[in-house]
Amino acid sequence: MPKRLDINTILVIGSGPIVIGQAAEFDYSGTQACQSLKEEGYKVILVNSNPATIMTDTATADKVYIEPLTLEFVSRIIRKERPDAILPTLGGQTGLNMAVELAKSGVLDECGVEILGTKLSAIEQAEDRDLFRTLMQDLNEPTPPSEIIHNLDEAYGFVNEIGYPVIVRPAFTLGGTGGGICHNEEELIEIVTSGLKHSPVTQCLLEKSIAGCKEIEYEVMRDSNDNAIVVCNMENIDPVGVHTGDSIVVAPSQTLSDREYQMLRNTSLRIIRALGIEGGCNVQLALDPYSFQYYVIEVNPRVSRSSALASKATGYPIAKLAAKIAVGLTLDEIVNPVTQKTYACFEPALDYVVSKIPRWPFDKFESANRTLGTQMKATGEVMSIGRNLEESLLKAVRSLELGIYHLELDHLKELDKETMKKRIIKADDERLFIVAEAIRQGVTKEEINEWCEMDFFFLQKVENIVNMEREVKANVGNMEVLQIAKEMGFSDHYIAAAWNKTEREIYDMRKENNMMPVFKMVDTCAAEFESATPYYYSTYADENESIVTDRKSVVVLGSGPIRIGQGVEFDYATVHSVWAIKEAGYEAIIINNNPETVSTDFSISDKLYFEPLTIEDVMHIIDLEKPEGVIVQFGGQTAINLAAKLEEHGVKILGTSLEDLDRAEDRDKFEAALTKLGIPQPVGKTATTVEQAVAIAEEIGYPVLVRPSYVLGGRAMEIVYRQEELLHYMKNAVKVHADHPVLIDRYMVGKEIEVDAISDGENVFIPGIMEHIERAGVHSGDSIGVYPPQSLSEKLKEQIIEHTIALGKGLNIVGLLNIQFVVFKDQVYVIEVNPRASRTVPFLSKITGVPMANVATKVILGQDLVEQGYGTGYHPEEKEVYVKAPVFSFAKLRSVDTTLGPEMKSTGEVMGKDLTLEKALYKGLVASGINIPTHGSVIITVADKDKEEAMEIAKRFHEIGYNLLATAGTAQSLEEQNIPVQVVNKIDSEDYNLLDIIRQGKAQFVINTLTKGKQPARDGFRIRRESVENGVACLTSLDTTRAILRVLESMTFSAHSMKEITQTKRHEVVHA
């Protein structure tokens, strides 16, 4: 059936900010979909609240709205634009839930808008646990024994009948939010309560636990003609019981017999047909390892994380084709863009193995519960490709950016058998490493299988790796052993340590012996047809398929997996850089390993290498391609950290030189540069021992800011208020020695300002200055940023511009730089300079219309700013106000403290824009998920140091009609100021207390500031966690609270009695 001609305008709904469970994969799918629809000649309108994406670039759609994804704002856009149809299935769970809400509100009928792709009835049938279960029964498809529940009593009824353990799956939620496995009554109460709270329809499915079965996924496509194909099937190495987003996954499945494969394939196709899904769909199944009994777990009637993985694993662009199917095209009409010869109805075939390993945020949140279950905790993932599973797995391990080069972790070597058993049974983020350690220590595969039901095939592969380690150690210098180790994916780093040589020596040894990898193409058809994709992976085999052209080329290093501190913003910069390289006439080559992102879409660059970002893997590509140079500025800290080693190998670093990069990163050199330029900075020194640290802190005076040098996202950064906290930090957070010094700075309580600039060495151009709402001390990534600055005097602005220009020239920056200033007592100090793209680049690029990464890349390639139409100075400010608000994923990470400080905790960001600061703030806060009711109750419990400041805030809350609740200490201070307050019991009280109020939803806001430094102030911690678990906005910064008050005050009509008004007037007359 040809494409539909009865519709012209399509509204695409994006997925909003990055949170755990919904990351960069929707930037990739949304971008593909918009381009795909434009190719077909439709007018595309996009709404999304996330400014950090390629998707929200003005070029992606005909009209782009960066607005909150709420019923209020999306309805407004529909009424204004009057689209013929909406396409929600590419916006993740957010998009689906929005479609359901829009349909129920009546706005789609009112405006005559239809839902494209998967129909509303199919979405509801797949997402509503009750409807789905009924459909499976009609199809005779087995599901685990289960019960739909709406309250705790119903849950007890089911458990009494079936027994523990049971799995709780909330309806219409993302990444298993609120769900989990219950082994006893205590867990049942906690998880069911949380699940019902997180489900927008207050519904959970309780099912008998089938943990231990194999978890298999099928990624399926269907069109309106009922053509249906399997794009890819995948197998979780972790059995059922761990969320698929937290599982290590391989494609294609490795342990299924042909009969099992066909049986599950037929089931998947039968389900997608019964649901009537048009587009992409993900089916999750459980298979009993000892029989042919299987169960259907769930269906995602949309493009998902798994479909991004399947697209990158096969080269088959699911989202692009799903968009074409949505407008009526069929699979047998669409040409496969990879082969450009076959049609999209050919099922992809793989002649390699793909591994995906999740990237968790536990390096940031040491206190988080690391146990994995049905609620997802990973922020991102890496993917790798190899010719055998061992190679594929080891490449994925070294892609994780955790400083790991092999399937072993030093700290696990001390574990005894009992501890290993416990951790393997319970499953945490290190389980695969513990399995390898257990095998090293002689535990049998049979025992491990008994503990965790991981398939023998996978255990055998881990054992093969361990056996090879022994071979490597026993045969130092043996070239045959080296060859086999390399074919299994062993890194030079590991072999060098085993052979007591340097990594470079092993690399050179292989080069002399012609032991270098070749590059194979990902072509969707196992080389059956000729293919046009420039998409490659390395392996040790015979024929090299990556043909080097005679064009001049430039390599861009990507930023690896999405994690806190290094999000999709860096991918945005990478993609823009690649486009600029192509515009400048060079061949653009990208190296990256994140399957979720736009940068790893093979249509973006001239060549894509899907490889780990380690010196060895990058050098293999550079040796083959011999580029003009490498750009490291856009890949975050990942790429910057490779610069020195690349230069040692004789590779040219384009842009800011290594020496100048080091001058901005190395404390002493940076101080010297600032002194020379006459730019002030907070007093600070470097310590290489604990004693030195104590002495420096005494000399500077507390509070001090402590951090290791060379970090991203404020990792292990803290503000400490006294000596015992400093000693606690030195002992627990960092291992200080001469190579890893600790920086100690005077902590200045001032206004923080952030600037992004582009320098060509002569000229420095400043697209924008941003002011942070939270004072210095809250990480810039967790602060609310405002552009243009609202409270900076012209004099201070000029100081900031002068310092920025001086730093750009003085540090010889070529390309981008990001500077953080603090304004303290009317004086501007520099906190830090990052000689690279920062996380604010996409935000400022969109607002100012200056494509910063693009301009910077052209500067790096030799085209100065004046040639590009920019000069030195500050870009004229926009009239509207723009707010960048952080988004957190605390609900997914139990036992993480939500207090904001110098260590970054947010996973994503949203933008609000309007004519006034209050309106822009309102949009930003609402888009970030904070509910802003105009009346209600606010609980105030603040540290003594904040009491005075909190009084003014409490008074303003009272004036707009809020009830104030406080514990005795804070209440007394309020009463002294004649502010009405209701005293509530502290949390250790047996009676009705503060936590009960939060649990019962009787408070709209909780204001809670951290008492003293970091030693766990348990009460405060429990208050903050309880707020998160119950969806109550918990404000840990008084600056954020003030921002919310501004919004509330602007929404509230003032109500003063006539007497008050006349008294004021009389007062004025007297003065006249």
Swiss-Prot record:
Domain MGS-like: 930-1072
Taxonomic path: Bacteria, Bacillati, Bacillota, Bacilli, Bacillales
Its biological purpose: Large subunit of the glutamine-dependent carbamoyl phosphate synthetase (CPSase). CPSase catalyzes the formation of carbamoyl phosphate from the ammonia moiety of glutamine, carbonate, and phosphate donated by ATP, constituting the first step of 2 biosynthetic pathways, one leading to arginine and/or urea and the other to pyrimidine nucleotides.
Catalytic EC class: ligase
A GO-annotated cellular component: cytoplasm
Subunit text: Composed of two chains; the small (or glutamine) chain promotes the hydrolysis of glutamine to ammonia, which is used by the large (or ammonia) chain to synthesize carbamoyl phosphate. Tetramer of heterodimers (alpha,beta)4.
Binding sites annotated in the UniProt record for Mn(2+) 1: 284, 298
Protein name, per record: Carbamoyl phosphate synthase large chain
Residues binding ATP 1: 129, 169, 175-176, 208, 210, 215, 241-243, 284, 298
Binding of Mg(2+) 1, residues: 284, 298
Binding site for Mg(2+) 3: 820, 832
